[in-house]
Amino acid sequence: VQNLKEMIVQYRNHPSIILWGVRINESPDDDPFYEKTNAVAHKLDPTRPTGGVRAIKKSHLLEDVYTYNDFLHDGKTPGCDPKKKVTSDTDKPYLISEYNGHMYPTKAFDNEERRSEHAIRHANVLDAVAGQEDIAGSFGWCMFDYNTHKDFGSGDRICYHGVMDMFRNPKLAAAIYACEQEETPVLQITSSMDIGEHPGCNRGNIYILSNADSVKMYKNDRFIKEYRPEMSLYKHLKHGPILIDDFIGDALEKNERFRPKHAKEMADAMNIVARGSLNHIPKRLYPTALKLVLLYHIDFAEVTKLYTKYIGDWGGTATVYRFDAIKDGKVIKSVTKEPVNGIRLQAEADHTNLTEHHSYDVALVRIRAVDAHGNVLPFYQEPVRITAEGDIAIIGPDTIALQGGMGGTYVKSLGRSGQGTLLLRSQTAGEIKIPFQVTV
C-alpha cells in the first residue's frame, strides 16, 4: 500500500497517465488487500480510474476497469477473446493490458520470416481488438526489448518482446503502429526481396506497411500495380498491412505469346505460386494449367522458365523493386529494394545540445548499418568503434557489435561548457561524426 501511495504522489501530475494499476502483477484475488489499494488510489487521485493487471478471467472486480493480459493469439487463433468471456462485470470497461510479448519473441537479427510474422501478429491483435466495440483498448507487450531474469531471454537474460530493440531502434513490427498516425509518412516492405533468404527461394507473403493514400510498385522501373488501404484484409485498421499479390503486372501480355485474357490467368497463377512453391501448386490452379497446356502446348519446362524470369529473379540482371507512397497525389516516400551494393553507417542523436542543471546531461545515439537506399541490413553484425572528443564522454564500451544492423550508445556532458564530437568508425561501413554543444 505504501508503494502505491508513493507511486501516485510522485507521478499523478503526468498527463500521459490514464489509469492506476492497483493490483500486484498477475496476482490472484485478495479482496481485503485490493479494497485498500483502490481506496488509496481514489483518495490520492480522484480524477483517474483504477485497474490491475490480471492473468485470470472472471476474477473479482474491485477496480473501475477490468484489465487482463490476453495472450490468446498464437498466429492461428483469434486475435483476442471477446469481453464477455473475460470480465466478471460486462457493465464496466474492459482493457487488454498485454498481448503478444512472450508468445513470439523476436530479435532484430532473426530471419525474415520471423520478423515479418512478428509484425503480422501485432496487426492481427490490433485488428481483432478494433473490431470489438466493447473493448476499450489494448496495450501490446511491449515497446522495447529489456534485460530480464534467468527464466526469460535466450540464455542472455534479454527479453526480445519489444517492437524496438533496447536502443529504441524499430523492428519491423513497429511500423504496424506507426502506420496508424497521419503526421509522419510511413512506408515499409516486410521483405528485402532476396530470394536466398527463404527456404526453397520462395519469399512467401510480403506486405506493404504504409499510411499513404496508395503505394505504387515498380519492378525494374516497370509499373506493376497500385495498392490502396481498402485492399488490406485488416478491415478494422485504417492502414492495415496490404499483401503484395502481383510481381508481373502486364509483362506476360506485352512480352510473351499469350492473349490478354490468358496472360492474366497465367500471371494470377504464377503470383499465387510465388507465395508458396513451384513444387506444390494448389489444386485450384489445375484447370488454368490444363487450359494453357491445351491452348499453347506449354509444358512444365516452359512454365519453370517463365516463373524464373518473372518471379524467381534468377540469372538475369539484378532486379530492382521500387515502392512509391502517394499522399494527396504526391510521392511522400520511396523504398527501393535491390541486391546490396554498398554499406554505410547512419547515426542519430536524440538531442545534440547537452544542458546541465542538477546533474550531467545524457543523449542516446542510435546507430544503423544501411544499404545505398537507406534500408537497414538485418544481418550486419560487424563492430563499430566509438570515440568521444572534446567536452563529452561515452557511457559504455568504446567498441560495440551491431545486432540486426542496429545498435546504440550514450553520450554525457562533463560538467563544463564547450563542444564535443562523437566519431563512429567501421572497417566496412565507413565513419560518421556527430557534433555536440554543451552548456553548463
Describe each model-derived feature in a short phrase.
Residues 1-206, 221, 226-231:
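Substrate-binding/catalytic cleft of secreted carbohydrate-active enzymes
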Residues 142, 147, 152-346, 375-377:
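Catalytic cores of secreted or luminal carbohydrate-active enzymes
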Residues 316-320, 362, 417-419:
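Extracellular Ig-like/FN3 beta-sandwich strand-entry sites
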Residues 203, 341-372:
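Beta-strand-rich domain onsets/edges
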Residues 161, 222-226, 379-391, 434-436:
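Short, well-ordered beta-strand segments
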Residues 235-246, 390-406:
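Low-complexity "stalk/linker" and mucin-like segments enriched in Ser/Thr/Pro/Ala/Gly
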Residues 206-210, 361-378, 421-424, 434:
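Beta-strand-rich structural segments
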Residues 310-312, 408-415:
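Extracellular/luminal low-complexity segments enriched in Ser/Thr/Pro
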